[in-house]
Design a protein with these regions (language model features):
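Peripheral, non-catalytic segments that deliver or gate enzyme domains
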Residues: 2-8, 12-24, 29-33, 37-70, ...
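Hydrophobic/aromatic beta-strand patches that form the interior of the parallel beta-sheet core
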Residues: 131, 283, 372, 401, ...
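A fold-wide structural signal in alpha/beta-hydrolase
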Residues: 399, 423-433, 595
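Short hydrophobic segments within beta-strands
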Residues: 228, 387, 402-403, 481, ...
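Active-site-proximal cap/loop segments of hydrolase catalytic domains
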Residues: 434-639
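Short beta-strand element of the alpha/beta-hydrolase
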Residues: 395-405
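Acidic helix/loop microenvironments that form the catalytic cleft of cell-wall polysaccharide enzymes
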Residues: 405-407, 485-486
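A structural micro-motif
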Residues: 55, 104, 196, 427, ...
């Protein structure tokens, strides 16, 4: 297929998949500066710039091996903290940067091989300190520590007795945790210091929460917690749990939407709870439907939010303010003008654009993402998104079914680099929130139980049928593309319905559910009860092991005849490289067309820009070859 759209500029893979010029801005507590992420030696690092002065921005971290994605201002203007893992192994360490002495190297404050920091917090009642969970004693168990930021001294606060996913620290020194009871429910408990045991406060149905209690946040006085709960509701709502009595009180809810669930999977995304910078009071809650909805809980934040919404026709995304709640930095989600970041002064009403992450991308050259609803064969409505190429008749197009991971996640409106690249090549892109996706209510979530390779796959098949029936897609030129669970879905697509797809791209997808679940990292194993074991099965049960194998693409490898591109990070802690090796070897032994791209310095998702660029060059070339699209193969380029 030749590209006959002279007014649509051809976008290089690098235009969309390279690191942004700037992103991830957060204002300093005193409101005088802001930090952001920008490239240094081809890696995202933390930079700091004055908001009012003319002082030149300076880079304050120096990681030339792997991009920094998570950082934190502290209450001391001297220190900045950031988190970093080792080439994608998900063992995140906490590092300290001395902002007053740029010549001093960053210090690893948790220098324990194989250890992982989680549950990081900066309690306002303990200035100069951080509280964190660390599993260096036992990879499967996270103990609670207090960190003195200036000296690096770690003090054990509570030794986790097991069964608690993480411990949190209240202002009065009381500690709480949430873990699984014997029957799989989630138990919120208080740490009893004298006995070193946990005492139950209340429980939540485990099957309602495959990823645990999300969100979970102690109130500033430590006597309660704000929790996302389905109890007595079809949609998640914020409840206040009294940590003495266990009594629940509804704080906020939306009549038709769930709380935004995305930060539970991607912690770099904004939390659904918006807190006051100084008091830590709850001032707003994020919900998510076709578009994002923020409900303000205070008059001051409602006024601020009204003014912020005037800055863009996108959705309010990341937010930060100074301690007084007067100076704000806000970024916006937008399908064609992504991440535009503004400074807003509530005292004066002044605002200005700080930066666009991708200033070289013209919004007019990018394709809009449209919400659509698809009815599955059993009548279930599947909220979905359709991106169509610009200046091309939306009929008989090659199409890519782009499947989100998780499966306890969801697609949402906004800038999607994969969808934009594919639309630029002339493909229609369909993203389906199949049953089991989060954010669409309890019934929709639980409709995925036991349905891997079953009704969850049928939803994707029905979505392809919908696109063909609507006239958008050429049934002979449909590909499937996904990562993690989406990669599994791609493999299921070519093994369980081998005639449906003309090509498939699997990024870190598990071809063998039995071995994948047995090889889960130690830190994940205690919490499989309400996600993988409930939705798919427990490989330690012989009957369930047999069912898991029957739902595994590797069990039907003899049926695969579709061209396949497999992409894998060598350090993936969740889907080991040996998993992808299995299916690649089996297919090559049968003479099936399979391309295999492995990156030695990546894990379950790719972070470094050259690796993302290499993957998408490979996918661009591969899809152009098999769908006769407008990618690099059609353009005569090579990879």
């Amino acid at each position: 297929m030749s590209d006959d759209r002279p007014d649509v500029p051809y976008l290089n893979v690098e235009d969309i998949l390279d690191s942004p010029d700037r992103t991830g801005a957060v204002i300093s507590p005193d409101g005088s500066k802001f930090a952001y992420l920008a490239p240094w030696r081809d890696r995202l690092n933390v930079w700091i710039q004055d908001l009012d002065g003319e002082e030149k921005a300076r880079c304050v971290t120096a990681d030339s091996r792997r991009s920094v994605l998570r950082y934190h201002w502290t209450d001391d203007p001297r220190w900045l903290l950031y988190e970093q893992d080792g080439d994608g192994d998900e063992n995140y360490h906490l590092h300290r940067v001395d902002l007053g002495n740029p010549d001093v190297d960053a210090v690893d404050l948790t220098p324990f091989p194989g250890a992982r920091v989680t549950g990081f917090d900066l309690p306002p009642t303990r200035p100069g300190h951080a509280v964190l969970n660390l599993n260096h004693r036992d990879p499967a168990v996270f103990d609670l520590y207090e960190l003195h930021i200036a000296t690096g001294e770690l003090t054990l606060l509570a030794r986790n007795p097991g069964g608690s996913s993480a411990l949190v620290y209240a202002p009065d020194g009381t500690m709480y945790g949430h873990g699984l009871s014997e029957d799989g429910d989630i138990e919120l408990s208080r740490w009893e210091t004298e006995s070193g045991t946990m005492r139950s406060v209340t429980t939540f149905p485990g099957s309602d929460h495959p990823l645990g209690l999300q969100p979970f946040q102690l109130t500033p006085d430590g006597t309660g917690a704000w929790v996302g709960s389905y109890r007595d509701s079809e949609h998640t709502r914020i409840v206040h749990v009294d940590l003495n009595t266990g009594q629940e009180t509804v704080v906020d809810s939306h009549p038709g939407l769930d709380i935004d669930p995305r930060a539970a999977v991607f912690p770099t995304l904004p939390s659904p709870l918006i807190l006051d910078r100084r008091t830590k009071d709850l001032i707003g809650v994020r919900y998510l439907g076709e578009r994002a909805v923020i409900r303000p809980l205070t008059a001051h934040f409602a006024d601020v939010l009204d003014n912020l919404r005037e800055l863009s026709d996108g959705d309010v995304a990341a937010l930060s303010s100074d301690r007084e709640g007067q100076r704000w930095i806000v970024s916006f989600t937008h399908d064609r003008d992504p991440g535009v970041t503004h400074f807003y002064d509530h005292t004066t009403g002044d605002s200005r654009v700080l930066f666009r992450p991708y200033p070289h991308l013209d919004p007019a050259a990018l394709a809009p993402m449209a919400p659509v609803t698809i009815r599955a064969r059993d009548g279930l409505e599947l909220p979905s998104y359709l991106t169509l190429p610009l200046q091309r008749k939306p009929a008989g197009l090659p199409m890519v079914l782009q499947v989100h991971g998780g499966p306890w996640h969801r697609d949402s409106w906004g800038f999607d680099p994969t969808a934009q690249l594919l639309a630029n090549r002339g493909y229609a892109v369909l993203q389906v929130n199949y049953r089991g996706s989060t954010g669409y209510g309890k019934s929709f979530l639980k409709a995925g139980i036991g349905e891997l390779s079953g009704a969850m796959h049928d939803d994707l098949v029905d979505a392809v049928g919908w696109a063909v029936k609507q006239g958008y897609a050429d049934p002979a030129r449909v590909a499937v593309f996904g990562g993690s669970y989406g990669g599994y879905a791609a493999l299921v697509g070519v093994s369980f319905t081998p005639g449906l797809f003309a090509a498939a791209v699997d990024f870190c997808g598990p071809p063998n559910l039995v071995t994948t679940l047995r090889n889960m990292p130690d830190f994940a194993k205690p919490y499989l009860t309400n996600n993988w074991h409930l939705y798919a099965g427990d490989p330690e049960d012989p009957a369930q092991e047999a069912d898991l194998w029957a739902r595994s693409p590797l069990s039907r490898v003899a049926d695969i005849r579709t061209p396949l591109l497999v992409v894998q990070g060598a350090n993936d802690a969740r889907v080991l490289k040996s998993e992808s090796d299995q299916i690649v070897e089996a297919l090559r032994n049968r003479g099936i067309d399979v391309e295999y791209l492995v990156k030695e310095d990546e894990g379950h998702s790719f972070v470094n820009p050259e690796n993302n660029i290499a993957m998408y060059h490979a996918a661009d070339h591969f899809l152009a070859r098999h769908l006769r699209g407008g990618g690099t193969a059609a353009a005569g380029s090579s990879i």
